[in-house]
Amino acid sequence: MADLDAAWTRLEAAAKAAGDKRIVEFFDAEPGRLDALTLDVAGLHLDLSKQAWDEAGLEAALDLAHAADVEGARARMFDGEAINSSEGRAVLHTALRAPAGADVKALGQPVMAEVDAVRQRMKAFAQAVRSGAIKGATGKPFKAILHIGIGGSDLGPRLLWDALRPVKPSIDLRFVANVDGAEFALTTADMDPEETLVMVVSKTFTTQETMANAGAARAWLVAALGEQGANQHLAAISTALDKTAAFGVPDDRVFGFWDWVGGRYSLWSSVSLSVAVAAGWDAFQGFLDGGAAMDEHFRTAPLEQNAPVLVALAQIFNRNGLDRRARSVVPYSHRLRRLAAFLQQLEMESNGKSVGPDGQPAKRGTATVVFGDEGTNVQHAYFQCMHQGTDITPMELIGVAKSDEGPAGMHEKLLSNLLAQAEAFMVGRTTDDVVAELTAKGVSDAEIATLAPQRTFAGNRPSTLVLLDRLTPQTFGALIALYEHKTFVEGVIWGINSFDQWGVELGKVMANRILPELESGASGQHDPSTAGLIQRLKR
């Protein structure tokens, strides 16, 4: 513990020293900076040279990782130990993308035979639906899938579909998550029940939002196909076979997963069966392979050359060394536009904790607030604040080096904006440059005195740039695994359990208490504000 405390002190001192300097000057002071802070891994190119650390800051961050025993924690995770201590569970989403026959154990018990058996069932089902061997009740092949889930049962598969979907898919995949009935109505308005397969994703088959939408979907099917016909249009991803049977799902269309797979890590599992069907098994297998490639890198690479470790350390340097409490993730890729929403759950649900496994308060700040959207759209939205606002927000900018999609010339324009923003965030624009430009335009000295400060960019905004060689199932899998392992490393260093989520429970309990009051007029005990709102809604 003393070594860890000392490492934190060194990091904070190094960050303070680096924070008084300009990032662009580090390149002159450190001739090897670009080589030291760029990596090529599994089809991804990472450039961390525009981050706010200098050589001493990077060294202090790596010392902190060693002091926190990141290597030991990494080994314990891959060995299947119960690193989710509050629930006594192993954490083995990595097993879902491991090759058949790999030696993977959860709490000492081999798991790959079961994992591969489920994968083979998924593959057979996906191929049968795509080929038309599995049909609907009226003999028509399925041309659409309605995927119903929420949280990890929605965000991951939805992002995965955006990344993998063909331009003109043979099967239309749509998603419903929210308990707001408008989403269900708008999503299903032009769908044909005779040609739609409904896939319900809920491990316990009790999730309120999911089961409300599942009930609506079943009623929609029954109205068109009758009770028995509706059953032929159902599949489920769940471990509650009694509940799926009662709902009408045939047993051979229920696909399970394991308690060592957390919801926000479950897109590698049968949770994404809908995508495997709609995009094709080869695409889904490529996604698994890309994740496995990043796993191998993370498991074996030394910390100073380890992509997930370095991305995590950059965030810790910003969060804890420089007190940057938010981070913006901007993919310059329409297919990756939902990445920030996915990372909000992955990172903020994993590391949004203020208490460690020992029940003691965390000694330092933990998860940052993650936000973002696709570039170049965000340049016309919140980038004004990013460039000239009073707070500095570190960024991750993500691009795709080569793309054959869309009209000629557009991808180069997209990439030019990506590179320009990364450079502008770092170098900024000096007042002298602005004054010279305005003077050349004949602007008066009085106007220059007021305009120049407004047009000055301080720069010195740190960013990491990630380039995918191409957006393929493999590189997308590597990207998601990169962020998963980054999140794990941060949790280890912060001394928290990244794999439970007690913070989501309280609201569920209270919603279940309030629902009868809205439905039947029952009364309950609430604070004055909540009680007043309930009375207003009862009118």
Curated annotation (Swiss-Prot):
Q: Where is this region: Disordered?
A: 519-539
Protein name as it appears in the record: Glucose-6-phosphate isomerase
GO term, biological process aspect, one: glucose 6-phosphate metabolic process
Q: What gene codes for this chain? A: pgi
For this protein, the record's PANTHER family field holds: GLUCOSE-6-PHOSPHATE ISOMERASE
Catalytic reaction annotation: alpha-D-glucose 6-phosphate = beta-D-fructose 6-phosphate
What would you give as a GO molecular function for this chain, any one?
glucose-6-phosphate isomerase activity
InterPro entries the record matches: G6P_Isomerase (IPR001672), G6P_Isomerase_C (IPR023096), Phosphoglucose_isomerase_CS (IPR018189), SIS_dom_sf (IPR046348), SIS_PGI_1 (IPR035476), SIS_PGI_2 (IPR035482)
Q: Where in the cell is it found?
A: Cytoplasm
Keyword line: Cytoplasm, Gluconeogenesis, Glycolysis, Isomerase
> Is Cytoplasm tagged as a keyword?
yes
**CDD domains on file:** SIS_PGI_1, SIS_PGI_2
